[in-house]
Amino acid sequence: MAERSALMQGTVVASHGRHCVVETPDGQRRICHPRGKKSHAVVGDHVMWQAAPQGQGDEGTIEKVLERRNLFYRQDEIRTKSFAANIDQVLILIAAEPVFSESQLARALITAEATHITPLIALNKSDLVEPFARAWERLQPYR
């Protein structure tokens, strides 16, 4: 039976369905799978992971998600989807055209406030003079 390696610390830098990419403190990246059926690790999570036994591939297993400073999520009527942890700021990118959804903007701002993450609203497509001016005016209450 192959011997398991010691637990190592890393940060999740990408998440793709049932696997994550974990970066080690020295900058190496390793594909890791969650232990168990449900993955609770999201980008930004600090995790404890374990490499596969020697001779059984280069991937690893996420054994534990460490305590989070915050968790950014998206919520609708049906479910909540977590997608980033331990972040300092969230950029909310709004397009001048098509017309942006104020309810989506409000949900993002409420989530940022609830999780103590500084929001930054950016208005895109400034080359579209009239739509940009209308969108800029609609953003007045958020300044």
PLM regions with names:
Residues 44, 112, 124:
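Residue-level signal for inorganic ion chemistry
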Residues 96-99, 125-129:
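Short histidine/acidic/glycine/proline-rich micro-motifs that form metal-
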Residues 104-114, 118:
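Histidine-anchored nucleotide/phosphate-binding helix
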Residues 118, 127-143:
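Canonical P-loop GTPase G-domain recognition
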